[in-house]
From Swiss-Prot:
Keyword field: Methylation, Ribonucleoprotein, Ribosomal protein, RNA-binding, rRNA-binding
Entry's family note: Belongs to the universal ribosomal protein uL11 family.
Gene Ontology MF terms in the entry: large ribosomal subunit rRNA binding; structural constituent of ribosome
Subunit structure of this chain's protein: Part of the ribosomal stalk of the 50S ribosomal subunit. Interacts with L10 and the large rRNA to form the base of the stalk. L10 forms an elongated spine to which L12 dimers bind in a sequential fashion forming a multimeric L10(L12)X complex.
Record's signal peptide: none
Family matches, as NCBIfam families: L11_bact
Protein name: Large ribosomal subunit protein uL11
Highest taxon of source: Bacteria
Amino acid sequence: MAKKVANVVKLQIPAGAATPAPPVGPALGQAGINIMGFTKEFNARTADQKGMLIPVVITVYEDRSFDFITKTPPAAVLLKKAAGVEHGSGEPNTNKVATVTKDQVKEIAETKMQDLNAADVEAAMRMIEGTARSMGFVVEG
C-alpha cells in the first residue's frame, strides 16, 4: 500500500547551499522532516548547479519520511544570468536594463522545457520572451 502524504512543502533554495538555518530549517521543522538528512541529500543532488536558485517540492509522508523533486531554476534567474545583470527593471516599459538574444532565449527555453506547460520549444520561447520583457530586457534577433 502507498504511503499517505501528510504535507507538501515548496521552497526555493540556492543549489548546494541548503543549511538548517532560516528559511529552510523552520519550514522543514514545521513539516516534521529530518532537516540534516534533507540538507545533505539536497546539497549532494544539486552540487553541479552551484549559484543557481533551485525550486524544490518536498513530499512529507505520515511516517515522517520524505521525497523531493528538484526543478529547473526560475526563468527570471536564468535570464539575469544570461544578460549578466543582478536585477530586472523596476519600470520595464520605460527603463530597459539588458539585452538577450533569441539564441539565449532558445537555450533557456530548452532548459526549462520539462517544467513549462508548452507544446514545443517555440511556445516555450514565447513564454521566456514574455518573462524577459516583463523584467525590462530587450529580446534581439
